[in-house]
Amino acid sequence: MRALEVSEINAQIKSILESTFMDICVRGEISNVTIHTSGHIYLTLKDESSSVRCVMFKGNARNLKIKLEVGQSVLIMGSLSVYVPKGEYQILCKSITLAGLGELSQAYEALKTKLGAKGYFESAHKKPLPRFPKRIALLTSATGAAKEDMLKVAHKRWNLVHITLFNTLVQGEGAKDSIVENLKRADSFFGTSESFDVIVLGRGGGSMEDMWAFNEECVADAIYSARTPIISAVGHEVDVFISDFVADVRAPTPSAAMEILLPDKNEYLRVLDEIMNSYFYALKQQFVLKSQALERMREYFKLYNFEQRYCAKVEQINIFQQMMRDSMNAVLEDKMLKYEHIFLSLNARCEEKLQQCQYEYERMLEVFNALNPHSLSTRGYAQISKEGKPCRLSDIDINEEFYLSDMTHSILAKRLQ
């Protein structure tokens, strides 16, 4: 058997290890960690009985999403590398995540797929935000920095809004139940005089475990069932949670939620100032133009002696009015004379006609009196009647009875011949 040099055995070990362990996943606890000024990260990963050195170069370190601390339990994805001169090996880290995040990521993706199939993310279900909200329900921790950030931004942008804080657990045991309970409480005012225009669900950043309540199905159900528009403002811009997909609007940060929701009063004041300045400028321009037009008209009047011509026209009108009055008086006098003549003529004819009617009346009265039955009876005349009807003597047969009547008496008679 040929004896191998140390460098040869180390080289063979390097070849075997690096070709065999090209893609590995190792779980362990960080025992120490150093971030070099070059951007490289050096750490030691250990378990109860062993340890191994690890390095993450600058290129991969830029994509690291967690802050590495001693005592953290992590999962490292990478490959083995052997340093031949010293016969040492280490893990070249491609990614480092907190242990347990693999299971959480799988649960996250499974719930996301399930809710997507149920239509929880459909844009048709999204409710629009009010343009000028008056009442906001804020669901966050009363002691968290997120609350202070949101209130500060809200006061700066639109201090007319009324914000009601629902103190909510946003991490740890009971967080999901607290979120669901307060969502339902805030939404229960919908349709009343104390209803909220929008609900803001917010908290600052943190680890996936800390933020997991916003990936719970019961929270998604409560958001989807709410009648009040909801903004999900959870974590940082790079963090995306199930609540972000289900909510009507997703804000990248809690502060951004208030910027999205509330108008900027300073911007509105600036626009108002621009409108007022534009209005006054236009008014000033109109005033200048009208003043110039008035001055031109004044000069025009002077040029054509409008004042003298106006006075002459007034004098002509006065003369014409006098002529009209004189003419009307003459016509009126002529008409009055004609009327008086007609009246006298008509009066004479009426008197003549009245006398003629009086004469006719007296003549007819004499005839009437002569034919009056009472007058005839006084002269011995009587009326003949048969069966209650007046008749002539020639209408009565021989031996037929009839009545003779005057104004006071009536007797039965018989024709004898």
UniProtKB/Swiss-Prot annotation:
- Which keywords does the record carry? Cytoplasm, Exonuclease, Hydrolase, Nuclease
List the catalysed reactions. Answer: Exonucleolytic cleavage in either 5'- to 3'- or 3'- to 5'-direction to yield nucleoside 5'-phosphates
Q: Taxonomically, which superkingdom?
A: Bacteria
Q: Where does the protein end up?
A: Cytoplasm
A single GO BP term for this record reads: DNA catabolic process
A single GO molecular function term of this UniProt record = nucleic acid binding
Record GO cellular component, one term: cytoplasm
Q: Which Pfam families match?
A: Exonuc_VII_L, tRNA_anti_2
InterPro entries, sorted: Exonuc_VII_L (IPR003753), Exonuc_VII_lsu_C (IPR020579), OB-fold_nuc-bd_dom (IPR025824)
Q: Give its E.C. classification number.
A: 3.1.11.6
Give the enzyme's main class according to its UniProt record, as a single word: hydrolase
Q: Which CDD domains match?
A: ExoVII_LU_OBF
Principal localization reads cytoplasm
Can you state the subunit structure given in the record?
A: Heterooligomer composed of large and small subunits.
Q: Which family does it belong to?
A: Belongs to the XseA family.
Describe the task this protein carries out: Bidirectionally degrades single-stranded DNA into large acid-insoluble oligonucleotides, which are then degraded further into small acid-soluble oligonucleotides.
Name under which the protein is recorded? Exodeoxyribonuclease 7 large subunit
Species of origin reads Helicobacter hepaticus (strain ATCC 51449 / 3B1)
